[in-house]
């Protein structure tokens, strides 16, 4: 488990040569569907760009706290930081 200010990443090694991601953005944390979907798109894009270093891992990313959509670069950067941590330690 890797954590940042607003995201949590669960990682499990798997015996395949690809990486997968699951996203949890609960309605309890972010009420508006438009904002939940925007956050998921940002995290998916970060995953797509860094998929090579996560080969052989199942990842689940969870939004821990509400965030402002104006902070989309911060969400993206936190996701990338967590992917980097996971790739280095596993």
Task: Kindly give the residue locations of the regions a language model identified.
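Positively charged, solvent-exposed patches that mediate nucleic-acid binding
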Residues: 1-90
